[in-house]
Amino acid sequence: MTELKNDRFLRALQGQPVDVTPVWMMRQAGRYLPEYRATRARAGDFMGLCTNPQLACEVTLQPLQRYPLDAAILFSDILTVPDAMGLGLYFETGEGPKFRNPVRTAAQVEALPVVNAENELTYVLDAVKTIRHELNGAVPLIGFSGSPWTLMTYMVEGGSSKDFRRSKAMLYSEPEVARLLLDKLVASVTDYLNAQIRAGAQAVQIFDSWGGALAHDAYLEFSLKPMQQIVNGLIREHQGRQVPVILFTKGGGQWLEAMAETGVTALGLDWTTDIGNARERVGGKVALQGNMDPSVLYASTSAIRDEVGRILASYGHGSGHVFNLGHGITPEVDPVHAGAFINAVHELSAGYHQ
């Protein structure tokens, strides 16, 4: 495999010295970029983009052609796993993802297959291989999956939800059915992430978008515990390199200490947690990734720069910080403002690494 030209993202995750704080953005390949919108139009629809390895590669690389980012992230969707389980994923304009065959009964859960990514998600693995080839060692490639709880919410609700009523009802009224569903998702996600690592992903992130919707103990039982099982089963070294694992629970600030005990390399933070406080709480056990509010990108470039400076100062000196947004970049952001954010991270962070 090609030697990495820029490995500061991987180095920061391992707490090794870096020259500047590395930066990438969740959803960096997305609708805020005109070139992404053009490629998506060629693909016909979102799933047409996800399932075409050449086009998925094209949009993965677009932000790197525009900005000096320190990592690429595979262009895909967390719902590829339930789609491969037979739920029939489709997208309705203005309404987001939907499933034709939601899972709501014990019989439906029992009938669900465990995903074999090599057989059922070859288009994702082909995209990983294509992207790695095209990157040619420029920066590392991040693979990802949704967390079992987050995937379960979409599968049970049949799409997005504001209150997760059906999913939570299953947790509390039929916990054994919920556990069986989560167990199948643990096996599927573990297989999927390991397949991405074998295909060339140099780090992986577990997106737990809806863990923060759970009660304190319910999070530990139904979200963190399944993620712990995945972490235990992941390939952690491949082709002579450590494979870092990042765990990101949106709204997960109250559980940082428990998350840091899972054996992951890093925790993603949303914008509601102070990163300096988080650093004190995890005590060097894990690196931290985050955590600017994506809405700051609507402000002036000088205000963006000020907020970047504030977060860097809060984290303080030394490695172990990967700068990112606290959630995905939103479609209406001016690409110039995204560039100002990335440049500010590199320019303002150098003094923290001397």
Swiss-Prot record:
Entry GO MF terms: uroporphyrinogen decarboxylase activity
GO cellular component, one term: cytosol
UniProt catalytic activity: uroporphyrinogen III + 4 H(+) = coproporphyrinogen III + 4 CO2
Protein name: Uroporphyrinogen decarboxylase
Binding annotation for substrate: 27-31, 77, 154, 209, 327
Domain of life: Bacteria
Pathway note: Porphyrin-containing compound metabolism; protoporphyrin-IX biosynthesis; coproporphyrinogen-III from 5-aminolevulinate: step 4/4
Gene designation per UniProt: hemE
Keyword tags: Cytoplasm, Decarboxylase, Lyase, Porphyrin biosynthesis
Family the UniProt entry places it in: Belongs to the uroporphyrinogen decarboxylase family.
Record-listed E.C. numbers: 4.1.1.37
Pfam family name, one: URO-D
Site annotation Transition state stabilizer: residues: 77
Quaternary structure (record): Homodimer.
GO terms for biological process, alphabetical: protoporphyrinogen IX biosynthetic process from glutamate
Listed SUPFAM superfamilies: UROD/MetE-like
Subcellular location as annotated: Cytoplasm
NCBIfam families: hemE
Functional summary from the UniProt entry: Catalyzes the decarboxylation of four acetate groups of uroporphyrinogen-III to yield coproporphyrinogen-III.
